[in-house]
């Protein structure tokens, strides 16, 4: 049978045994990829600096997902939080990877078995002896089982009743760790940044799934509904399954890109909106102001800013800065962060404090402009010297560092001042090692960006797939030219047109 590539799946259309087989094989491929990818990432991952070289800077994709579910230790003796451990146990990164690979192998064997032994009694209708699936009943079984899994995850794993809990952090991604989470049953449970909502929603959705599954197992659909929604057609199952998948893909693309309790910034990196809104910058200034109010010096106040918080306030960690086709991790772009140089404060010769305007997300280049506390432009790096009025040289700008490696160091020569003014456009200033990975200096996106792009793209593709297969199953008779209520046996193929009234008939 010479089928075109886009019609090859018709071979399992009326073959339940082999339909099951190819789905088991697909599960084997997915689990095998996950386990293999985890082992690859563990082979290249450097856990030595969780502050300046976290997993998301290194381009890790599956390690963050394991970590948010409670895996923090490695058989290599390290912990994701930076410490060392002696007994990681079976549920370590390598243990989870190995479990996926073993599961993949078992699924592979099961797929082969079901391909060979495809003609099982369970797939046959007792009355006709032909292959037949009770799709509403199967739907009820699957709904019930997924409800049990959903409820179990929320009630046991997330809450720590039987499991580790999940990754929970503060709003600024500084104190994250795996811990049990109590369900949030109030209105706060609907806040996407409240971890308790994860527990309560899984418990509620799981309960609903269990009840709905039992309903569909005990109540048969009305005949009119059964026929209207083509519940006896396997392509209906395909269409509705695709709908569930694309809807989920759109949802997770949103929670990843805009941020939520399910996508902590310590594991996936900050969101672009945290740069756009000056989220970390405001918190840093708040802490410095609080320090000054306690009679600390400017140097002392800035020295107490956590390096981790300062690093978030750097445009190179913005996932929207990476180009669409720039492959590689963030470390391959601007380099591996080595240390915070400190916060530069610029002043003109009259002693006014000046602030460098920060580069917006979607700019590759941006003019260097320094404004005072009232937003009035006081200095810049001009494009044409002949026209300049506010150049660093003319205004006499100096820079002094507070906190970090250059704490207390000041510069007055214009070349150095301009260098740090350009770097201040990009947020807090860090020393970056470009030599180790031969980094090219061009920003890359984080796994947050990759995940969002991939899931949004496939969601759109699957949306069209849902429309396509839904239309095919609902209007099958129209497309085939066959009346669904046809009670005469028709010899199709005897004439060029299906449904030709001159076609030979034989009354049943």
Curated annotation (Swiss-Prot):
InterPro entries, alphabetized: PS_antenna-like, PS_II_antenna-like_sf, PSII_PsbB
GO terms, molecular function: chlorophyll binding; electron transporter, transferring electrons within the cyclic electron transport pathway of photosynthesis activity
Cofactor binding, per record: Binds multiple chlorophylls. PSII binds additional chlorophylls, carotenoids and specific lipids.
SUPFAM superfamilies linked: Photosystem II antenna protein-like
Gene3D superfamilies attached to this UniProt entry: Photosystem II CP47 reaction center protein (3.10.680.10)
Oligomeric and partner information: PSII is composed of 1 copy each of membrane proteins PsbA, PsbB, PsbC, PsbD, PsbE, PsbF, PsbH, PsbI, PsbJ, PsbK, PsbL, PsbM, PsbT, PsbX, PsbY, PsbZ, Psb30/Ycf12, at least 3 peripheral proteins of the oxygen-evolving complex and a large number of cofactors. It forms dimeric complexes.
HAMAP family on file: PSII_PsbB_CP47 (MF_01495)
Official protein name in the record: Photosystem II CP47 reaction center protein
Natural source organism: Manihot esculenta
Lineage, uppermost ranks: Eukaryota, Viridiplantae, Streptophyta, Embryophyta, Tracheophyta
């Amino acid at each position: 049978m010479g089928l075109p590539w886009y019609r090859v799946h018709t071979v399992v259309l009326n073959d339940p045994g082999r339909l099951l087989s190819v789905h088991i094989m697909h599960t084997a491929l997915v689990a095998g990829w996950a386990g293999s990818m985890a082992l690859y990432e563990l082979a290249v991952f450097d856990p030595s600096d969780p502050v300046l070289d976290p997993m998301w800077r290194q381009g890790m994709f599956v390690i963050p997902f394991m970590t948010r579910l409670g895996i923090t230790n490695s058989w290599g003796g390290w912990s994701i939080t930076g410490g060392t451990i002696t007994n990681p146990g079976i549920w370590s990164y390598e243990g989870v990877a190995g479990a996926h690979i073993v599961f993949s192998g078992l699924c592979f064997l099961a797929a082969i078995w079901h391909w060979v032994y495809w003609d099982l009694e369970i797939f046959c209708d007792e009355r006709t002896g032909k292959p037949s699936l009770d799709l509403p009943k199967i739907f009820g079984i699957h709904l019930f089982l997924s409800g049990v899994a959903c409820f179990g995850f929320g009630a046991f794993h997330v809450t720590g009743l039987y499991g580790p809990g999940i990754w929970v952090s503060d709003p600024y991604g500084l104190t994250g760790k795996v811990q049990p989470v109590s369900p949030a049953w109030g209105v706060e449970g609907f806040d996407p940044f409240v971890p308790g909502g994860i527990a309560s929603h899984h418990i509620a959705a799981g309960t609903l799934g269990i009840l709905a599954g039992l309903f569909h197992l005990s109540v048969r659909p009305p005949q009119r509904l059964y026929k209207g929604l083509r519940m006896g057609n396997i392509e209906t199952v395909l269409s509705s399954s695709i709908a569930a998948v694309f809807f989920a893909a759109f949802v997770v693309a949103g929670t990843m890109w805009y941020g939520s309790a399910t996508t902590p910034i310590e594991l996936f990196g900050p969101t672009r909106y945290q740069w756009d809104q000056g989220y970390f910058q405001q918190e840093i200034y708040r802490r410095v102001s609080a320090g000054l109010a306690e009679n600390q010096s400017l140097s002392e106040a800035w020295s107490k800013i956590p390096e981790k918080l300062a690093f978030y306030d750097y445009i190179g960690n913005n996932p929207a800065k990476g180009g669409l086709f720039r492959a590689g991790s963030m470390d391959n772009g601007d380099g591996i962060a080595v240390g915070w140089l400190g916060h530069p404060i610029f002043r003109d010769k009259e002693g006014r404090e000046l602030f460098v305007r920060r580069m917006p997300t979607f700019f590759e280049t941006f003019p260097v402009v320094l404004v005072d506390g009232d937003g009035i432009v006081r200095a810049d790096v001009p494009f044409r010297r002949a026209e300049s009025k506010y150049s660093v040289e003319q205004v006499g700008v100096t820079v002094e560092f507070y906190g970090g490696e250059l704490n207390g160091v000041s510069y007055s020569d214009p070349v150095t001042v301009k260098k740090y003014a350009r770097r201040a456009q990009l947020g807090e200033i860090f020393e970056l090692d470009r030599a180790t990975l031969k980094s090219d200096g061009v920003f890359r996106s984080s796994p947050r960006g990759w995940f969002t792009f991939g899931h949004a793209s496939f969601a759109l593709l699957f949306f069209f797939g849902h429309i396509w297969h839904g239309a095919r199953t609902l209007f099958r008779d129209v497309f085939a030219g066959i009346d669904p209520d046809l009670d005469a046996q028709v010899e199709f193929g005897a004439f060029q047109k299906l449904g030709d009234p001159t076609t030979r008939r034989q009354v049943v």
